[in-house]
């Protein structure tokens, strides 16, 4: 039995869902995954499935050979494919007596605090009802600047949202390697990662752009988001879904990313990962030190430069003078006001703006370290 109804998020990508030799879904892989998820449910786990494949299924249904490049066409094709994909899942899960639900999300659903809370409550109700939520990005209505961009990131944000204990990223390789094993015979497997800084040399590339900017790069980003939310993350082979059962039984399969100790509350996790920054504040060394080491709020005096056009209460990146992000937070002034008061002492703000505002630019309660 699962300890205390643990929650798992399982993400499967298009490469694992589709047949590499001919168009269409890899039904044997999907059926195997469905069977494993049903076993996990019987063991007491709550399971969320994040499934790609809507655009690919839509292309097959419409007889299109290539993935569309135009956004509007891709969104239309996703609408065609999503229904067929869900029908496949529903048929397979129904055979095993497991109810499912479709949950389509956009980044905007997580960027607004009330909608974020509503999404959390919906997932909790589905778990109470014994339902497996199947999640995908709502491609048909998502605007480019508010897209998750990939389902790896979406799955990590969902894992953080539902306070999962595990995130499984099912892919077309069996684990993470020091280079692309399909291109480099000297690539070495990586079995466990205690800190993502250990992988900086891999993330920097050097083995060809396909490996550095493709699917594995997004999985490392997802692992960072999830582990910061204390979610243990595993990359493993998608065509062997039975690996999930073996991993939960303690077998060292795939690449494990150890969770970081929980240091922030749910609201700060939302600020760190749910929001999309609309601006950037460049800070002097004193402000950087005060925020990183002292846990202080950001004052106007520490701001050297401002980038972007944003409103009060928008999310912004806080960066050192090299442009390296050190934190994120909710700003108390809009970009026009900040241009006037940057570098000033807090008691000068009312004289400059002509009205009394907040003493802090970003209060420490609305700030989270990167």
UniProtKB/Swiss-Prot annotation:
Organism phylogeny: Bacteria, Bacillati, Cyanobacteriota, Cyanophyceae, Synechococcales
Coiled-coil segments: none
Family annotation (InterPro entries): AceGlu_kinase-like_sf, Asp/Glu/Uridylate_kinase, G5K_ProB, Glu/AcGlu_kinase, Glu_5kinase, Glu_5kinase/COase_Synthase, Glutamate_5-kinase_CS, PUA
Domain PUA positions: 278-356
Name of the protein this chain belongs to: Glutamate 5-kinase
UniProt keyword Isomerase, yes or no: no
Record-level Gene Ontology MF annotations: ATP binding; glutamate 5-kinase activity; RNA binding
Record key words, sorted: Amino-acid biosynthesis, ATP-binding, Cytoplasm, Kinase, Nucleotide-binding, Proline biosynthesis, Transferase
The reaction(s) this protein catalyses: L-glutamate + ATP = L-glutamyl 5-phosphate + ADP
The protein's enzyme class: transferase
HAMAP family, A to Z: ProB
Organism: Synechococcus sp. (strain ATCC 27144 / PCC 6301 / SAUG 1402/1) (Anacystis nidulans)
Pfam annotation, one family: AA_kinase
GO CC, any one term: cytosol
